[in-house]
Amino acid sequence: MGLTSWLFGGGKSPQEQLRAHQRSLGRAERELDRERTKLDQRERALIQEIKGSAKAGNTGAARIQARDLMRLRNSRKKMMNAKTQLQAISLRLQTMRTSEQMMQSMRGATRLLTGMNKSMNIPAMARITQQFERENEIMEQRQEMIDENMDDALEEDDEEEADELVNKVLDEIGVDLSQGLPDAATQIGTVPELKTEDNLQARLDELAKR
């Protein structure tokens, strides 16, 4: 099923179909906002847990919690990307609604002028009718360009590096990832070298004395 069939299928008018789809998108955006609030609360709790584990010298727990926080932030980022796409689609639908209204008005004016031209047979009215028809074609071409540009924009999706997410939270508690915790994106399940363990333990011991 193409986009046009999805938008304007059924017994409803195009305007009614567009309004219904916009309401559905609005509900989806609100649900994403609620989920983001829950993730924000969980993030704050995880940061406190990481700080507590670091001060207690619990290296293993700090690693696990840092990876959990990394996954949480990745999930939130994907959620925000999804919301951005929903907003872009909603804007596209609104643009289509506006364009549809304008084209309907122009078609109505064109039909009116055509009828007047037939009854009055005035060359000036014929020129005005031709101008309206040209403007109508331009509007349709612009709508096609808007659709193509919006499709290109929806395909863009940036991805953050996982180690940057872990580094950020560990910087907050005074632990340097390059000297302490292993990179969560590449070293999960591996055994760190003894020197790395010693460096991390020393930093955790120092943090616990603060």
Swiss-Prot record:
Phenotype seen when the gene is deleted: Leads to multivesicular bodies sorting defects.
Region (Disordered): 1-38
Annotated localization: Cytoplasm; Endosome membrane
One Pfam match: Snf7
InterPro entries in UniProt: Snf7_fam
Lipid bilayer topology: Peripheral membrane protein
Protein keywords: Coiled coil, Cytoplasm, Endosome, Membrane, Phosphoprotein, Protein transport, Transport
Listed GO CC annotations: cytoplasm; ESCRT III complex; mitotic spindle pole body attachment site; multivesicular body
Basic and acidic residues composition bias: residue spans: 26-38
Gene Ontology biological process terms in this record: endosome transport via multivesicular body sorting pathway; late endosome to vacuole transport; mitotic nuclear membrane reassembly; protein transport; protein transport to vacuole involved in ubiquitin-dependent protein catabolic process via the multivesicular body sorting pathway
Principal cellular location given in the protein's record: cytoplasm
Residue runs in coiled coils: 15-97
UniProt record similarity statement: Belongs to the SNF7 family.
Function statement: Required for the sorting and concentration of proteins resulting in the entry of these proteins into the invaginating vesicles of the multivesicular body (MVB). Acts a component of the ESCRT-III complex, which appears to be critical for late steps in MVB sorting, such as membrane invagination and final cargo sorting and recruitment of late-acting components of the sorting machinery. The MVB pathway requires the sequential function of ESCRT-O, -I,-II and -III complex assemblies.
PANTHER family documented for this protein: CHARGED MULTIVESICULAR BODY PROTEIN
Entry protein name: ESCRT-III complex subunit did4
Organism of derivation: Schizosaccharomyces pombe (strain 972 / ATCC 24843) (Fission yeast)
Higher taxonomy: Eukaryota, Fungi, Dikarya, Ascomycota, Taphrinomycotina
Gene: did4
